[in-house]
Amino acid sequence: MLLSEVLQVLRGAGKVGAAFTSTQGEQLRLMACNSTFGAGMKAAAEAVEGVMGTVMGGGDMTSKTDEFAGIEKWEEMDLDEAAKWSVASEMPPDFSSKDGRGETSETPVGAATGTIKGAGWPAQNTRFLHVSASQHHFRFVHDSIVARLSPEDIQRAREAKQNIARPVRQKLNERAKERKVPATRISRLANFGGLAVGLGIGAIAEVAKQSFGGKRSEVGALLDSPLLSEANAERIVNTLCKVRGAALKIGQMLSIQDNSFINPQLQKIFERVRQSADFMPAWQMHKVLEEELGSGWREKLSSIEEKPFAAASIGQVHHGVLPGGKEIAMKIQYPGVAESIHSDINNLMSVLKMSVVLPDGLFADSSLEVLQRELAWECDYEREAKCAKRFRNLLKGDPVFVVPEVFDELSARRVITMELVNGVPLDRCVDLDQETRNEICFNILQLCLRELFEFRFMQTDPNWSNFFYNSEQNKIFLLDFGACRDYPELFTDHYIEVVHAASVGDRATVLKKSKDLKFLTGFEAKAFEDAHVEAVMILGEAFASAEAFDFGTQSTTQRIQSLIPVMLRHRLTPPPEESYSLHRKMAGSFLICSKLKARFSCRNMFLDVYNAYKRQQQERRSQV
């Protein structure tokens, strides 16, 4: 009897010892992965477990399985969830190791996150056991975790953390579909007609939902309307992604506004428009290449991928390789887009006028005239190639910005080929450290000022995907030069004085120079003059103080929005033609800084540009 009780006690002690060995051995392994003595510690831990396992006779471990319910599902893991776990805290959310090199893969924003097999990490519905070092009570997970996580994996994770935005190859958004581009005006009109009918039905449903207890958006956005409900926004996006061209370009412009301009539900859906349109089938792409480059176009390439890695409003981009091995990006324009600019904009405006009432002070006709001219520029790839070469020459030797090389032998009116660049668009840089984000945004804003006041030649499309950041080289690659334009000297002479006056609080000079620029006729109501000057002063705040300006917390957009109703009500003349593209670019640059939550002083940046401009101005006048 006594002997049997002793044996039971010993058996129980054996189980306790085995469990203790397992948990403490697990701790040793995790410590080993982070230690310079990793290999030796790992071997020691394995030896201890081997000896203890023999002594304890392979104790019953069923309690371990019971304790970690659902352990058989741990082979599948959501990559984003892994980043939240203690051991994986050194990994960026999109880190994966495929071939031992620790390469990263880019997942398009909004794409569904897949599962990773064999990663050995718990699934999302599994909670990690807390570790309390102060109580000396350690509990860890199953052996398979450490078995799949070597010291080399940890080192690669640490390196990846320092290069969250390391260069990766672009991928087409998973939402994009292969669909023939409607190339004739009649086929494009049919799509817009179907959209108008769908919007009407959707608006009736939205009004009914609001009338019977549905909640109306509380955001007082300018484009907030029952006709622009989320369901109707889906209809708009699907149509724009199908027809592409000028209509899609307008949708992409809306996507980079903040929710002070459009309601947040629409903004999320228009974000899909910005990221990727549908792409044309291979036969349609081949037809364009043959018409532009001739029947022997394939002989100029070593290879080309049939499916594009990016699809935008006017064209899609394919990866290719030259006979010498150089990688290229070939942008191919959708058929019928250039010929349909005027009709597309008229069709879209007809739909938009159903949705919102456009105030007279918006001068929509003037805006559309400027927009049509700019879209015609963007459809001329020969013009874009010249602009890209001009920018490449202006920024030659620049320590930050790089313009890819253009290959003339593979470029024409509807095809432009440039060298392939590696990096990530700026909206993927939000997780970089504060110092790096500040540096990126400082350079972007400084370039904006240099383009206007030094080059008097600006790339006016502020789409975040037109700026690719390469963390390994610490360079920003500039892409898409279709929207480039010159600014006359007389315009910049007055405009720089407006910005300078705003930075020093000189309201009288702001008003005078605004009249010189034809923003005002001189016959406007006092309310309009005050609102205009106040809007300019708000925009000048970033350049007014020597202290760091916090773009992430500023309320610039909201404050200007409060002035818009007054300006639209009392405006007597459309703004100067140059201001449309200029203000789009400047607003986009500020939004980049806001999205990346940058903090830096802008005053000296502007003063350097201003003083250099005044010196050049004096030199020009002395020569005359």
From Swiss-Prot:
ATP binds at residues 313, 331, 418-421, 466, 480. Keywords: ATP-binding, Cell membrane, Cytoplasm, Kinase, Membrane, Mitochondrion, Nucleotide-binding, Transferase, Transmembrane, Transmembrane helix. A motif (AAAS motif) lies at residues 310-313. GO terms for cellular component: cytosol; mitochondrial membrane; plasma membrane. Atypical kinase involved in the biosynthesis of coenzyme Q, also named ubiquinone, an essential lipid-soluble electron transporter for aerobic cellular respiration. Its substrate specificity is still unclear: may act as a protein kinase that mediates phosphorylation of COQ3. According to other reports, acts as a small molecule kinase, possibly a lipid kinase that phosphorylates a prenyl lipid in the ubiquinone biosynthesis pathway, as suggested by its ability to bind coenzyme Q lipid intermediates. However, the small molecule kinase activity was not confirmed by another publication. Homodimer; homodimerizes via its transmembrane region. Interacts with the multi-subunit COQ enzyme complex. Belongs to the protein kinase superfamily. ADCK protein kinase family. This is Atypical kinase COQ8B, mitochondrial. It comes from Danio rerio (Zebrafish).
